[in-house]
Amino acid sequence: MRRWSWVVDALLIAGCAAVAALLKQDANWDQLQYHYWYPWQLFHGGFTDPDLYGGRFQNPLPQVPFYLLTSLHPVAAQAALGALAGVAAVVTRRIAVRVLDGGLATSTAAALLAVVGAGFRSELGTSYSDVLLAAMLLGGLLLVLREQPLLAGLLAGAAVGLKYTSAPFALALLLALLVVRWRGLLWWVIGAAVGWVVTGGAWAWQLWRTYDSPVFPFWNTVFGSPWFPASNLTDERYGVAGLQGWLHWPWDMARGTARVLDLPVRDPRWLILLAALVLIAAGARRMTRSGWAVLVFTMSGLVLWLAVFGVIRYAIPGEMAAAVVIVMALRLWCSDRVTTALTLALAVVTGVLTTSAASRRVEFGTSWYVVEPGAFARVQSGDAVLVDGQYPSTFLLPGNLPTDVTVHVVQKDFTPTPMRDWLLRDLAGARQVWVVTGRPPSQVDPTIGTIDYDNCSRIR
């Protein structure tokens, strides 16, 4: 049975890789603006501050796998991205094995129900790193179930160090640990601290040294950086508001009206999760400690996520664990065979009804990026380049500018801050200032004045 278990895991990874390779090449907005640019800067001498752009303040390490994979042929690179996402499916199946009194088929069906979710499908074969962080957090849950709190904390802390959006499910891991083995709390905390230092400590120090805050520009009411107003910088476009919003959210997700992304997203599995909770409540006496731990992780993580962020990409750990909860609820009342059949039916039906965020894709080429030769030939040493934050274009720059040219990305959210004066002081010493933008008006305009768009040239 163990041999077949490894075979199924390999097939899950291979299946995700194959699906990713069959899609067109990922060209999502965030990738073109900062998923490639900031890792490139990381490997080529560091950052040119100030950047008046939110992506600058995120740890670039989660994007390094994508950056390195772009050296491959685009089809191979995207297949590799799909394979990395498949790790989350494998870990989900392993969690199901721990909590379900069933065979290989039931746990595999749980993994299939997990991968048809809107969040996972939105990130499959893309440059987004949230699915990789989900694999780490789900791995932490698996380690909690195996009563290995030190390693579980290590993965949780590392995920938070890479991206603070992992925090809700890292805290959910802690609650799950209290269900399984509360005496392991100290070891979990030690592991989490070490994990955060390893992946996020250097980045926090870099932000502190440059912007006087280890989490700049977030939580500035606490850290008081002089470069940003004293606010906590929350995005109110997403999530829920008021009791009615909380109660309606599963139904809104099923209808596709929930505010979880800029693109339409629909996932009926959230309504099914509510039904699963009813089944679990009715059969609570037959629940195992491991089952309660998975339930606590899923529900507490989802509540924290929805209260703080509400962006579906950040909920992938809970989205995938929810599949295990649904199968767990069925298994309380049905045989192993019936549970497997019902789970597969749910995976097919919900997979058809689910709408994932269809980000921009283009036809595959011979390399991941192809920039028109000579597009930046007029830029010379000592110049400065400003990139409009509302038009994704930093991917055009790597390797196409003189090494001593400074590049600054400008976003309107940061132009009313003291960072604008810092930028203007730096630009005063530039031989010439160039702007990379789309059609006017540009977000650079409020910083340096209106641009003479009539004399601009097109870059491909």
Regions found by a protein language model. Name each.
Residues H35, L346-V407:
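Membrane-embedded, lumen/periplasm-facing catalytic core of multi-pass transferases
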Residues H35-W40, D130-M136, A159-Y164, P168, ...:
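Hydrophobic/aromatic-rich transmembrane helices and adjacent perimembrane loops
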Residues W37-Y38, L42, Y53-V75, L247-M253:
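Short hydrophobic/aromatic helix or loop-helix immediately within or flanking a transmembrane segment
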Residues V90-A118, A135, L151, R289-W292:
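Transmembrane-helix signature of polytopic, membrane-embedded enzymes
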Residues W188-R255:
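Membrane-lumen/periplasm interface segments of specific transmembrane helices
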